[in-house]
A protein has these predicted regions:
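Positively charged, low-complexity intrinsically disordered leader regions
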Residues: 1-20
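Structural motif
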Residues: 2-4, 129-130, 180, 211
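Hydrophobic anchor at the start of a short beta-strand
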Residues: 3, 46-47, 73, 150-151, ...
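Conserved phosphate-binding/catalytic region of the ribokinase-like
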Residues: 4, 193-311
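Active-site metal-binding loops of divalent metal-dependent hydrolases
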Residues: 7-9, 136, 157, 249
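Short catalytic helix/loop segments, enriched in acidic residues and glycine
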Residues: 19-38
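Conserved N-terminal subdomain of the carbohydrate kinase-like
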Residues: 19-23, 45-130, 300-311
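Conserved beta-alpha-beta core of the PfkB/ribokinase-like small-molecule kinase fold
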Residues: 130-202, 220
């Protein structure tokens, strides 16, 4: 059994304000599904990414960030005619502004067409792979519908849901192979309104996952299984530097413990796993970046221009 993330790789580029200018200070791997994989790999789980990226410096950094955690990157396609996808985050205290456009040169560093095709996935996904997916992006929907593998799915944004009818949402999410479905509070409330219901338990009954997690930020999380809701309250970190990736790390712990416990869920198991997940997220938010708790990261020196123009 291995955990597998699909889709093109993404970088997180961090900047700080220097007077009226921006200064690039750090580049690391990003995107929820790959952050989940990184956390799983750091704890010794078998992991793989089937992906694509550019042959640029950013792509090299993102690949190295996974390889140093022993993630299998054998099936990553690198193309020389693209720049690796990148989010640009300007850090101000413990807050950040995120764009897909370089704040130094103004270039958009995000291509929309996937490098990797579903046919490529079919060649390399094994029947017992557990697929890590985030969001209902167009490239994820056929994977959810057609691949028989067990899947864990995190939906953190409502943007993609707006373009789907209620019937389409149900056709995607009422999938017997979705083992764990994680939503944040915004998505939960959006779906409750969409389906004209009033309670989380009704939403669980409509979507029919094996196990549902609803994260509520600093208020903690709700866990739903077998028509029961268990609420857990977070123990807060005293030193919060950056909350990027906290939800991904939290999710990774529940994924791992779910399978280690042979998919058995109990109140005691939720209590125990929540303590481990809470401790992990406390470490995540104490560092800059989603993976700062896993390794030192790539703090750049001697780069006088923006990363978009490097050769």
């Amino acid at each position: 059994m291995r955990y597998v993330a699909l889709g093109d790789l993404v970088a997180d580029c961090y900047y700080k304000n220097v007077g009226q200018d921006k200064e690039l200070i750090k580049i690391d791997g990003g995107s929820s599904r790959f952050n989940v994989i990184a956390n799983l790999a750091a704890r010794g789980n078998s992991t793989c990414v089937i992906s694509g990226c550019g042959q640029d410096l950013v792509g090299k950094i993102v690949l190295n960030s996974l390889m140093r955690l022993n993630v299998d990157t054998s099936f990553v396609i690198r193309k020389g005619n693209i720049r690796t996808r990148a989010y640009h985050l300007t850090v101000e205290g413990n807050k950040h502004i995120c764009t897909k456009t370089c704040p130094i040169c103004g270039n958009r560093t995000w291509y929309n067409q996937e490098v990797v095709t579903i046919e490529y996935y079919k060649k390399h996904i094994k029947k017992d792979d557990i697929l890590i997916l985030d969001g209902l992006k167009p490239e994820n929907i056929p994977i959810i519908k057609t691949f028989p593998n067990e899947k864990v799915l995190d939906i953190g944004r409502i943007k993609r849901l707006d373009g789907l009818s209620n019937t389409e949402i149900l056709n995607i999410l009422q999938n017997k192979n979705i083992e764990i479905l994680q939503l944040n509070e915004t998505v939960e409330q959006y779906l409750i309104r969409r389906f004209k219901i009033s309670k989380l338990l009704e939403l669980f009954q409509i979507l029919e996952p094996k196990f549902m997690i609803v994260t509520r930020g600093k208020e903690g999380a709700d866990f739903v299984t077998q028509n029961h809701i268990i609420h857990k309250t977070l123990i807060h970190c005293q030193k919060e530097v950056d909350d990027t990736g906290a939800g991904d790390a939290f999710f990774s712990m529940f994924i791992q413990k779910y399978y280690e416990n042979c998919k058995r869920i109990s109140r005691g198991w939720i209590d125990e796993t929540f303590l481990l997940a809470n401790d992990l997220t406390t470490r995540v938010v104490s560092h800059l970046g989603a993976r700062g708790h896993l390794y030192d990261g790539y703090y750049l020196k001697n780069i006088n221009n923006c990363i978009c123009k490097e050769d």
